[in-house]
Amino acid sequence: MSNAINQNGTGLEQQVAGLDLNGGSADYSGPITSKTSTNSVTGGVYVPPHLRGGGGNNNAADAESQGQGQGQGQGFDSRSGNPRQETRDPQQSRGGGGEYRRGGGGGGRGFNRQSGDYGYGSGGGGRRGGGGRFEDNYNGGEFDSRRGGDWNRSGGGGGGGRGFGRGPSYRGGGGGSGSNLNEQTAEDGQAQQQQQPRNDRWQEPERPAGFDGSEGGQSAGGNRSYNNRGERGGGGYNSRWKEGGGSNVDYTKLGARDERLEVELFGVGNTGINFDKYEDIPVEATGQNVPPNITSFDDVQLTEIIRNNVALARYDKPTPVQKHAIPIIINGRDLMACAQTGSGKTAAFLVPILNQMYELGHVPPPQSTRQYSRRKQYPLGLVLAPTRELATQIFEEAKKFAYRSRMRPAVLYGGNNTSEQMRELDRGCHLIVATPGRLEDMITRGKVGLENIRFLVLDEADRMLDMGFEPQIRRIVEQLNMPPTGQRQTLMFSATFPKQIQELASDFLSNYIFLAVGRVGSTSENITQTILWVYEPDKRSYLLDLLSSIRDGPEYTKDSLTLIFVETKKGADSLEEFLYQCNHPVTSIHGDRTQKEREEALRCFRSGDCPILVATAVAARGLDIPHVKHVINFDLPSDVEEYVHRIGRTGRMGNLGVATSFFNEKNRNICSDLLELLIETKQEIPSFMEDMSSDRGHGGAKRAGRGGGGRYGGGFGSRDYRQSSGGGGGGRSGPPPRSGGSGSGGGGGSYRSNGNSYGGNSGGGGYYGGGAGGGSYGGSYGGGSASHSSNAPDWWAQ
C-alpha cells in the first residue's frame, strides 16, 4: 500500500510525523490532515530509519538556518535534508548524499538568517568517504572526492567511510563542519554535529576516536599534508594511516597486529639444512672506509618494526652477503654487490632500506609551481628488476618487512591490468618495485614522481642490460628528475658483474664499495651437476627416464619440484604437451603467456599441484622457489652465465640440489667455459667435454665476447676494477680489447670514466691466462708464472 498523500486519508509518514518517539511533546497536537502535515508540523517531521544518523537534521527550521549536515551512508542511498524544503529553495540547503555502503555526503550549503549570507558547501563524500577540497580526496576515505564550492570556504569534511584494510568493515562517521563565509554559520555547523538525533533508537554505540573516522572533527576536510590519510581526521578502520601520517608521527612505531596477514606473509619458512656451509665462504669488500661486517642482526641498530619482521621471517642469522651489505647500506654508502644466487640478496637491501625509511619518516612533496595533486605519488625508494616474476617476488619480500608499519610498497610491471596498478598507486606508496618499461609509462602518465627518491636499487643489473633496458634505465636515473648521484643512495645487486657492467656503474654510483661474496660468477657447491651426452632426437626419451628415476627415488617427496629449461617458447609448449600426454603433472611458463597465466603456473608449481615446470629463460633469473630439488637443462644456453642462473634455482639458501644437462654437438660453444665451472665447483668432468675443449684449444678459435686472459682473467667481473693495475707493454688507452685467442699476449690498458680509473690486466696469453701475467686468475689453469694484478692475497685462485 502506498504511503503517498491522498485526498481521502493520510499516509503512514503523516500519521507518525507528530509522534514524540523521544519522550517529549510534539509541536502540534491537533489532528493530522493533508493540509496541516506539511506546513504546520514543523518540529516533528518523521525521519525514516534509513535516513537517520549523522547529517540529517530532524528540525526543518533549524536546518534552514544551519544547512544540511553530513549524510553518513548507513548502507542505503542516504540523502540528508528534507526534499520538500529543497524544492522550495534550491539554493537554501544542499546536504551531501552517500551511495549504498559508501561514505556520506558533505555538509550543506547553509543559509544564515541573521546575515542573509549563503555558506559554501563542502566536498561531497566520495567512495568510502572523501570530502574536503578537491585535492583532499583521501581525507576520511579512499579517493574520488567531489568538489563542493571554493576549497578555501569548504564546509564539513567527508564522512569517515568504511575502512579498506583487512578485518570487518564499519560505517564511517561524519566529517567536520569546516569553515564558512560566516563565522556564525561555522559555529552552527559545529553545534549541528554535536546535536543528538531526536530518535535515538537507531543510534549506534560510541567508538573510540580514530576507530572508524567518526571523530574527524572540524579539520577533517581541508587537510593538505602529503600522503596523510587521517593525520587530523578521516582514516578507515584498520587503516595504516588511521593514527596519522604527517611529520609529527613516529614511523618507527610498531603498528597493530593482523594474525591472518601474518600467516599469509610468514606462514612458510625454509632456512635450509646446510646453512652452516655458508660460514666458510670467503668475502671481499673493497673501497674506502668499509664499515665492519656484522655477525648477527643484533649487531646493528634496527627499528622495532624490522626486528619484529626479521624474527617472523625466521632469519636466525644473516647470510654472508647480508653480514656485509646491511652495515654498508645503513651507513649510507653506495654498493655494488656480487653474490651467488640464493644467498639472500633481496633481504640484504630491503632490510636496511626500509629501516632507514622508517627513521626518515614523512617527506613532504617537492615544491613546484604547479598545484600538487594527491594522485601523483613521490616514493622514497625504487627497486628496478628485469622481469615481472622477479619484481613480484621482491614485492612479496617487501611486504614482509613492511608488515605493521606505515610504509606501503607497490609493484609495477607490464602485461597486467594498468588501471588496477594505478588504483594501487592511488592508495599511496613509499617503495616501488618495478620493471623499467612500466615505471616509465607511469611516470609519463603523471602517476609517479622521482623527485623524492632517496634509495635506488638495480637488481640483476647485468640481466637488465642484456635485455636492452639500458636506454630506459639511463632515462629513469638521469633525466626524470631523480636526485643526482651523491644525493641518493644507489645499490647494484646481481650474481654476475662483467667488467662492462662495472664500468657502467661508475655513472650511477658514487664512492661505492665493491662486495664480492663467494666465487664470483660461480655456482654453489651444494648443487651436484651432471652433464650427459644426448643426441637431439633422443632428448625426450632420456627426459622420461630421468623423471621416472626422480619419482621412484628414495628422497622423493610430493614437495620435490623439478624445473626443466628449454630455449624457445614453442619448445616449451611442445614439451609440456608431450609430458602431459605421458601422464606427468606439468605446467609451463614463457614470455607469450599472459601475466595471469604465468602467475597461476607459478602458484601451481610452488604448491606442488604441478611438480614439473617447463620454462624458458624468463623464469631463470632471481626467482626464489623453495623445494626445487632438480633442475634439468633440456636445452643448454649459449653462455655459461645463463647456465649459472638456471641451475641456481636449486640448492638455494644452503639446501642440496641436483642439476642435469643434456649436451651434444650443438653446445660446443659453451664447452670450455662450462668445463672451467665444473672444475671450480669440484664436479665430475665428462671425458667428452675434455676432448672437445682440447680440440677447441688447439684449433685457435677466437672466444666471442670475452677479453684476453680467459673467463676469470679479464671479462667476468671477479674483481673491483678500480684496484686493477694498468700498464703493460704494447697496451693501448681506452677499453681493454675484447679479442684474444690462443697465444695472444700484450698488456692491458686503462679505462677512465667519471673519475674512476680501471686499469687493464697485464699479460694474458692463452685461454686460461697462462704465460706472463694473465689477469686475476692467471696461472690457475695455464702453465707458466702468473702475476696477479692486485697486491691483496688472491683467494679466488686457491
Curated annotation (Swiss-Prot):
Subcellular location: Cytoplasm
Role description: ATP-dependent RNA helicase that is essential and required for cellular function, larval growth, and for male and female fertility. Also required for RNA interference (RNAi), double-stranded RNA induces potent and specific gene silencing, by acting downstream of dsRNA internalization. RNAi is mediated by the RNA-induced silencing complex (RISC), a sequence-specific, multicomponent nuclease that destroys or silences messenger RNAs homologous to the silencing trigger.
EC code: 3.6.4.13
Feature: compositional bias, Basic and acidic residues: 198-209
Record note on disruption phenotype: Flies are recessive lethal with a larval growth defect phenotype. Hypomorphic bel mutants are male-sterile due to defects in spermatogenesis and female sterile as oogenesis usually arrests around stages 8-9 and egg chambers completely degenerate.
Similarity-based family: Belongs to the DEAD box helicase family. DDX3/DED1 subfamily.
Modified residues (Phosphoserine): S177, S179, S214, S219, S638
Protein name in UniProt: ATP-dependent RNA helicase bel
Binding-site residues, ATP: 315-322, 339-346
Pfam families in alphabetical order: DEAD, Helicase_C
Positions in coiled-coil regions: none
Entry annotated with the keyword Repeat: no
UniProt-listed CDD domains: DEADc_DDX3, SF2_C_DEAD
Tissue: Vas and bel colocalize in nuage (perinuclear, electron-dense granules in germline cells) and at the oocyte posterior during oogenesis.
Residues of the Helicase ATP-binding domain: 326-515
Polar residues bias locations: 31-42
Motif DEAD box: positions: 459-462
Listed PANTHER family: ATP-DEPENDENT RNA HELICASE DBP3 (PTHR47958)
Gene Ontology BP annotations: autophagic cell death; cell differentiation; gamete generation; instar larval development; male germ-line stem cell population maintenance; mitotic sister chromatid segregation; negative regulation of gene expression; oogenesis
Keyword terms of this UniProt record: ATP-binding, Cytoplasm, Developmental protein, Differentiation, Helicase, Hydrolase, Nucleotide-binding, Oogenesis, Phosphoprotein, RNA-binding, RNA-mediated gene silencing, Spermatogenesis
Main enzyme class: hydrolase
Comp. bias intervals (Gly residues): 94-110, 118-132, 154-178, 706-717, 740-750
Gene3D superfamilies: P-loop containing nucleotide triphosphate hydrolases
Catalysed conversion reaction: ATP + H2O = ADP + phosphate + H(+)
Record GO terms (molecular function): ATP binding; ATP hydrolysis activity; mRNA binding; RNA helicase activity
Motif (Q motif): 295-323
